[in-house]
């Protein structure tokens, strides 16, 4: 079991055969950098063991930021021998579960089952896939609890630097959604688009999620108005994506809003097919190349999106 675990976390080669059903644990891929220290192995049953690991950096590499994650995966004895499986797959039977459309909802302790909001998310998935003509064969696993930290614990993430107690927070990892809300459309969009377009620029992913799902419990139109006031007042250099690393207050990021404004522009110019074309870009600069905007005109183009 231990030998297979060491081989399975090697990110330099295809390790899917070490995993039950070839499904690699999300948290390994998210926290593959740095060093791994397995500090405990606990028996859950005769066939399943829980493996507890800390992902960390040497202090010389990132001073003051040592622990990247504390997480759990499981090892299961199968006909092929010991294989790894997602922690949630091992313990999901402990949680109340409902299925609507393509979404499997799981509820932490004390969470009210609100079928109206669940239906909003399930219906949005079908409408979005139809609108964009996307070939999406995944099911979405939607975990909800009283806080994001509780949701994270359900999938085996005991700690990440992204811990938060904000009620509107959410997170999508592949086709897994963690949220305190059952109709968190921003994260639903991520759960669809991130697996389909893993190489697309992050600001497009945040843009399309913010365009349809808003951010910080505010719709896109509201945050666009806030960004408009900032863009009109401040002299922002839009020549590179680092210039977008600006907080507009109340957890509204200029990075997300500019991405959403570009999605809006693409829809106006060529509809959903134009949006999908932009997702073929590999970086920030290529997005503007596809839009036909050279670097000297980039700042004026982006400001024009807010007129």
Regions found by a protein language model. Give the residues of each.
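Solvent-exposed, polar/charged alpha-helical surfaces in well-ordered, non-transmembrane soluble domains
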Residues: 3, 119-130, 191, 210, ...
């Amino acid at each position: 079991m231990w030998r297979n675990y060491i081989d399975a976390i090697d990110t330099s080669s295809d390790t899917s055969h070490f995993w039950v059903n070839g499904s690699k644990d999300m948290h390994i891929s998210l926290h593959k950098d740095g060093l791994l220290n397995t500090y405990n192995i606990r028996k859950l049953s005769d066939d399943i063991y829980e493996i507890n690991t800390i992902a960390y950096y040497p202090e010389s590499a990132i001073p003051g930021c040592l622990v990247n994650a504390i997480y759990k995966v499981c090892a299961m004895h199968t006909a092929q021998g010991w294989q790894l499986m997602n922690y949630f797959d091992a313990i999901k039977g402990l949680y109340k579960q409902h299925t609507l459309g393509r979404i499997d909802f799981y509820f932490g302790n004390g969470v009210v089952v609100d079928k109206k909001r669940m239906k909003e998310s399930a219906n949005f998935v079908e409408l979005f896939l139809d609108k964009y003509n996307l070939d999406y064969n995944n099911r979405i696993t939607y975990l909800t609890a009283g806080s994001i930290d509780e949701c994270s614990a359900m999938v085996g993430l005991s700690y990440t630097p992204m811990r938060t107690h904000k009620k509107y927070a959410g997170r999508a990892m592949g086709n897994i959604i963690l949220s305190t809300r059952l109709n968190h459309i921003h994260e639903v969009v991520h759960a669809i688009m991130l697996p389909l377009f893993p190489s697309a620029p992050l600001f497009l992913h945040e843009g399309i999620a913010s365009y349809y799902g808003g951010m910080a419990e505010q719709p896109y139109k509201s945050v666009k108005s806030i960004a408009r006031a900032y863009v009109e007042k401040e002299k922002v250099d839009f020549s590179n994506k680092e210039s977008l690393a600006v907080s507009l207050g109340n957890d509204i990021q200029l990075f997300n809003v500019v991405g959403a404004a570009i999605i809006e522009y693409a829809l106006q110019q060529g509809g959903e097919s134009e949006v999908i074309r932009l997702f073929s870009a590999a970086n920030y600069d290529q997005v503007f190349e596809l839009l036909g905007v050279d670097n000297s005109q980039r700042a004026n183009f982006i400001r024009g999106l807010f007129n």
